[in-house]
């Protein structure tokens, strides 16, 4: 699994490096270098949340050793911090393979200065932290719903399939969307600046705007603190909540005779609907 993960990270890094090389120069020379960073910020947040949201739910609230750790004289804040570190590193891996090529290509093809270097590194940090915040909030919502639903594994599996479908739909349309973006840079830039000012500030941050760097980092730190405060007040109740599922009683009966392919198919379908990770 480690080899597969490294291959996936390498593949994504190569794809987004090529994307950076293809659009960075045109956007920078059009005076829209900030829009270049804004585009990759959105992609980085999407990938960071997509890559870590399920790990947030399973690793934070459904970890098998939660009961053991909570029974030991370990502060809850220490347990929560260790769980959040794992979630953060997962999100950093997925967002970093997008943001790191974006920043390096900008330094090479557009501008290399102290402000640009600091702004680029700060942008990578901000995106990874915002991905952590969004993953934690989504994981918290999922955990609250999960504790009240029946057929939890089936619903979680369906939700995962929907997210995967949305992800691949975006990937397949990425080239067409980028072509439309490049054809209407001025209109897109005006729309983002007027209707999504925080994203504009993050784009300016990547270019080395000191005011944008200070504002974005301050807001990001505040959001991280509020998220930790929310999780610290609800973690114990959710992590120790007993599920409402009832176990089926075994009833003796005759097993139907099936062919080997049919039996294997039935077994795999059962695993698919009972295990979200599968």
Whereabouts are the PLM-identified features?
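A short amphipathic helical element positioned immediately N-terminal to and/or at the very start
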Residues: 1, 197-206, 260-273
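Short, small-residue-biased leader/transition segments that mark boundaries at the very start
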Residues: 3-5
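Long, hydrophobic alpha-helical segments
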Residues: 12-14, 36-56
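Transmembrane-helix bundle segments that line or gate the permeation/cavity pathway
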Residues: 52-62, 77, 81-241
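Short helix-to-coil transition segments within interhelical loops
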Residues: 70-75
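Alpha-helical membrane-protein architecture signal
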Residues: 77-85, 258-269
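Loop-to-transmembrane-helix entry motif
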Residues: 88-92, 268, 272-276
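Juxtamembrane inter-helical linkers in multi-pass membrane proteins
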Residues: 236-266
């Amino acid at each position: 699994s480690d080899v597969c993960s490294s291959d996936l990270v390498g593949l994504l890094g190569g794809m987004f490096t090529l994307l950076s090389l293809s659009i960075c120069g045109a956007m920078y020379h059009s005076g829209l270098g900030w829009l270049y960073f804004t585009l990759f910020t959105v992609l980085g947040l999407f990938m960071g949340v997509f890559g870590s949201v399920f790990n947030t739910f399973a690793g934070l609230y459904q970890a098998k050793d939660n009961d053991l750790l909570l029974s030991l004289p370990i502060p809850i804040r220490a347990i929560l911090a260790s769980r959040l570190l794992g979630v953060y590193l997962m999100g950093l891996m997925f967002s970093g393979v997008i943001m790191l090529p974006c920043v390096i290509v900008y330094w090479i093809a557009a501008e290399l200065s102290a402000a640009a270097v600091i702004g680029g590194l700060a942008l990578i940090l901000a995106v990874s932290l915002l991905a952590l915040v969004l993953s934690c909030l989504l994981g918290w919502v999922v955990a609250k719903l999960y504790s009240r639903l029946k057929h939890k594994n089936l619903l979680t599996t369906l939700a995962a399939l929907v997210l995967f479908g949305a992800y691949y739909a975006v990937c397949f349309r990425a080239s067409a969307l980028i072509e439309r973006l490049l054809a209407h840079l001025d209109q897109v830039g005006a729309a983002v600046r007027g209707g999504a000012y925080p994203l504009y500030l993050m784009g300016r941050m990547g270019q080395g705007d000191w005011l944008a760097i200070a504002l974005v980092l301050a807001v990001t730190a505040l959001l991280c603190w509020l998220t930790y405060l929310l999780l610290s007040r609800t973690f114990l109740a959710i992590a120790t909540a007993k599920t409402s599922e009832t176990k089926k009683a075994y009833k003796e009966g005759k097993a139907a005779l099936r062919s080997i392919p049919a039996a294997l198919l039935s077994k795999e379908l059962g695993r698919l609907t009972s295990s979200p990770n599968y």
